[in-house]
Amino acid sequence: HYNCPVVAYYPEVIAANVGDAAKITLIHDYLGLHRKRDFPVKAHAMLNQYFDGISLKEVKKAAKAAYEEYYGYFEKVRARGEETAEKQGKEVIVLAGRPYHVDPEINHGIDKLIASYGVAIISEDVISSRVKKFHTGVLNQWTYHSRLYAAAHYLKDQPHMNLVQLVSFGCGVDAITTDEVRDILESEGKIYTQIKIDEITNL
């Protein structure tokens, strides 16, 4: 259960390269959100390295509220996506991108352009949880990649759904995901579509 290695190590890069970083409290300890039971204890130990007077009870309360909000967000995304996908007479495009691709300055309005052709658009978050574990041709350890592969696999029994993958030039790891998603889709008789985004600010 890992996140993007580039993003995960931004704090390390800052600490090593920004001289003024030593003058501020830069917290970049490693915590696993997937271990819900252990998280409050580890978060409490981490916070006590930097601040005084934070009790374990307070951290447990905050963690409980945070997890509820986290899971609630995904439930809302899935519910809205399912509502969109079930509209009568509409083809569905699973527009799969990294989390930062929801930023209009990055995605260039590609979602709106595709929607203008009369299709419904959902994200991979909506359907990825419907798939049980399955074999992949690559080491499947990153959170986003797991959702992406699961979404592609789910489409095998969905004739009205197709997947479009957004890829940024700067993401080297997507050299792996694009090949695997292509293999999954083509093995299921689907056409793989990739849109590679550069760093301009319009279409």
List each model region and its residues.
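An N-terminal assembly and electron-transfer interface module characteristic of large anaerobic redox
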Residues: 1-203
